[in-house]
């Protein structure tokens, strides 16, 4: 349509309406790519700094575009935990394979510590509490339980001592790694030497696990 304004009047021809642009999903954007990018961001900037907005900026898309692939931040963090948990148990299982006793314990602990220090954001993701259904449905988490409990059964432990021993190892490894990452060990004692002595102490504790009083 042609607009011909009258010569004697101040008149501006209306601009033609712009056609509505259809949003096209970013090629190659998948849930797996988002979760991997979120894990990388956690390692680089810190777990608490992983947000949907920060992730959207990485892919140069609107925040709303991410909801096609994840249900929200909670879902993203759950997926990060499963990704990191799978990576971590792969390292641990490979380190423990073919080893028994103290050698297996030291290999397990070393792989745990190595992953925690190399991937602080991913490691932080593994510390969130997951619902029972998610844990049950995750092959990686089931494998984690199998490897961990297998290590401790070799010391002759049975329930409920098995669960108590798992908690002892987890709190020892996690506490040491958290303090080391924070630079909180101020004494001049060599960190590797202290770590090795902790493994010695844990091995002796597991070998001489206290008997429970009869119920």
Q: Language-model segments: what does each one mean?
A:
Residues 1-45, 54, 58, 74-78:
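Basic, helix-initiating cap at the start of DNA-binding domains
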Residues 33-40, 44, 58, 75-95, ...:
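Alpha-helical structural segments
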Residues 48-49, 74-75, 103:
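Residue-level preference for short helical/loop micro-motifs built around acidic side chains
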Residues 60-70:
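Short hydrophobic/aromatic patch on the recognition helix
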Residues 93-124, 142, 159, 169:
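Hydrophobic alpha-helical connector segments
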Residues 113-135, 178-186:
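Amphipathic alpha-helical segments used for helix-helix packing
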Residues 132-168, 189-204:
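Amphipathic alpha-helical packing segments from all-alpha helical-bundle domains
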Residues 171-188, 203-212:
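Amphipathic C-terminal alpha-helical segment
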């Amino acid at each position: 349509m042609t607009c011909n304004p009258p010569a004697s009047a101040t008149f501006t021809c209306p601009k033609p309406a712009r056609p509505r642009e259809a949003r096209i999903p970013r090629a190659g954007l998948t849930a797996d790519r988002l979760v991997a990018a979120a894990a990388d961001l956690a390692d680089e900037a810190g777990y608490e700094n992983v947000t949907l907005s920060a992730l959207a900026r990485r892919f140069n898309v609107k925040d709303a575009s991410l909801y096609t692939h994840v249900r929200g931040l909670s879902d993203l963090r759950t997926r990060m935990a499963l990704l990191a948990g799978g990576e971590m148990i792969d390292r641990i299982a490979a380190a423990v394979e073919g080893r028994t006793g103290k050698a297996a314990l030291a290999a397990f602990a070393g792989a745990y510590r190595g992953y925690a220090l190399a991937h602080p954001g991913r490691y932080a993701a593994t510390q969130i509490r997951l619902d029972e259904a998610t844990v049950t449905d995750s092959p990686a988490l089931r494998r984690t339980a199998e490897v961990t409990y297998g290590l401790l059964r070799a010391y002759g432990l049975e329930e409920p001592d098995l669960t108590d021993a798992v908690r002892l190892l987890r709190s020892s490894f996690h506490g040491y790694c958290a303090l080391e990452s924070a630079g909180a060990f101020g004494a001049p004692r060599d960190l590797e030497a202290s770590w090795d002595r902790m493994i010695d102490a844990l091995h002796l504790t597991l070998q001489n696990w206290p008997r429970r009083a009869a119920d």
